[in-house]
Amino acid sequence: KNSETDCIALCDVDDTVLKERSENVKDITGKKPKIYKDYRKLLDNKDIDAVVIGTPDHWHCLNLVDALSADKHIYCEKPISNSIEEADIMLKASLEAKKCVQVGQWQRSGGQYKEAMDYLWSGKIGKVRLVKVWAYMGWYGWVDNFKDTDAPKGVDYSMWLGPAPLRKFNQNRFHGSFRWYWDYAGGLMTDWGVHEIDIALWGMNAKNPLSISAAGGKFAYPNQDTETPDSLQTIYEYKDFTMLWEHANGIDGGNYGLSEGIAFIGSKGTIVVNRTGWEVIPEKDHRNGCLLYTS
């Protein structure tokens, strides 16, 4: 899409993915990229100015620090890391390297979010007392249990594990479903929550909460071998408002009839925004029946 950008190299531990994606690049650009199975060798390529890190979450810290050491600009997929300690290491490396580093909170690029934020900041819905944030993902439901096996042919499983604990290969812990295991990720909260909570914090200009409390578990699918909660509620306490995150795997019945979104609940109305658009739900003055906000 950008004529000033060339995709000259790809790296993946899976030969099947490398073959498919390199063909995709060739179909789009007319040029076949150089392929690597070890990202460190890709970083040695002096013709590369910038890299996109789209590895499983447990690899982000090492990938980013090594890319900065190789003098590359970086776009790193969310979540930035799996721990505060890793994030601190990545921030320090980014500040010292003085390269361009962006984390994939791309949801902010949706025009509806900026429109909703401008309306929120106008004060028309009054004092915000509660922000609700949610993701109900029906398509993230039951996962069949599989026995451990040898890794598929063409997969460098040792490199895939990287800094994660050594264990036998299991189909459920590989590719997209790695998200449901603590060794590699944090479940639906770190997959969808980082997007939705980012919008909530942006709207409220909020940073560190005073306290956080959470409750949840594997309530819907207790017998499958995944580890992260399929149901979760988390309360973030701030000085003059609270934020509530909630998620559920396997069902779509979220707040306001939406499977995902953010709601800013004010004294005069509520702003609800998600990837499909935004709306304002007005409150009434029950003394005279009038709406409490103006468009």
Stretches found by the model and what they are:
Residues 293-294:
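Conserved small/polar residues in nucleotide/adenosyl-binding loops
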Residues 69, 94-96, 155, 175, ...:
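Short, solvent-exposed loop/turn segments at the edges of secondary structure
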Residues 158-241, 251-255:
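Rossmann-like dinucleotide-binding domain that binds NAD(P)(H)
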